[in-house]
Amino acid sequence: MTRKYIYIYIYIILKVRARVGANNKTLINNQSHLIEMRNTLMLSDLPGDLLEEILCRVPATSLKQLRSTCKQWNNLFNNGRFTRKHLDKAPKDFQNLMLSDSRVFSMSVSFHGIPSVEATCELSLIDSFSSFEDKFEISQVFHCDGLLLCTDADNTRIVVWNPCTGKTRWIEPNNRCYYYAFGSYLDKSYGNSYKILSYSGYGYENQELAIYEINSQSWRFLDVTRDCILERYTDYGVSLKGHTYWFASDEKEKNLSVFLVSFDYTTERFRRLRLPYQCPDYNTASLSVVREEKLAVLLQRENTSRTEIWVTSRIGETKVVSWSMVLAVDFPSELFILSGISFLVDAEKKFVVCCDNYFGEDEYDTKNLVHIVGENNKVREVNFGVSESSWPFLFNYVPSLIQIWEGVGGKRKRVE
């Protein structure tokens, strides 16, 4: 890269920092040097491929601030090929989100000094079909590539939402399957694309499966041979590198160990993945994702308070997946960990953040709780207030510019 383009790169980075609130004094000093350069050098001088290489390495949350400053950049940010390239190359802005009382909140988690967690802001999803622009009440949420698949409590409304760009796509629901997952695959015609998998429930044989293809905008039933049953330790699977993962058990041999099963949206097939150790059942089991690279499981066997958090090797790098235990804690007896718990883990700092729901003696005495637990078994509890609707759900999120609302034709069809 020539010095000329290095200066342009510096200019772009400074512009990004200015838009996201960098120190004004520093910017003034830097901009005094750039003013003269800008008089003789315009962004139009920058070759398109080099501009892409620069911008695809700037975090999505920073790029969205620049959308309105340059028509050329705005067109680029709307280009599907660029947004996919950006997803692959841009630094990951890892965030923690929580679904609580039908709303999604951004969470700040700190392990320095006294561990703390707090909701910093609400990510508002406006109901496009409401005359008064009411907020959409979310019952389930599923994350993949910076997109959130959200459903309502009655499973009559489905929307794919990008909180970073604010764009949405509303989808006709499947009337026969009430649980949903979301993943990506490589389409020969469209490139990277997305599908929604719906299934009829947990814990029994002959679970119906249906697929919604974003490109064709239609549902179809999935005729696939399975030898396992999806187990309801939690209402949510997790997405990692386009695949969805759940807990499962053998369809014929019910006494065999519980395992993980993944769904590949390209081949539309299931594949088994062994857990760290064999166990026919767990008191508590939950899945999470670590930095968009690894799977994590929280496992608590029956009749014990010992809870273990295991993390895999990087998914996709080798055919064989290995497990490492990063944390083992004995939860206090007064902390009753339920199967519906969701969690995040910091493998380096040896902390786990759990989110569940407390039920009091009064049917209206319910509240959402977040627990921070470290190697010393000390539990810090944060009360997030009275819960009136959905079970709280804590999950990882990485903002992106990915969009699925342009250039896809096809007539919308409904599964009856």
From Swiss-Prot:
InterPro entries per record? F-box-assoc_dom_typ1, F-box-assoc_interact_dom, F-box-like_dom_sf, F-box_dom, Gal_Oxase/kelch_b-propeller, SCF_F-box_component
Please list the residue ranges annotated as the F-box domain: 40-86
Please list the disulfide bridges: none
Which Pfam families does this entry report, sorted A to Z?
A: F-box, FBA_1
- Extract the NCBIfam families matched here: F_box_assoc_1 (TIGR01640)
Q: What's this protein's name?
A: Probable F-box protein At5g47300
Instruction: Give the species this sequence originates from.
Output: Arabidopsis thaliana
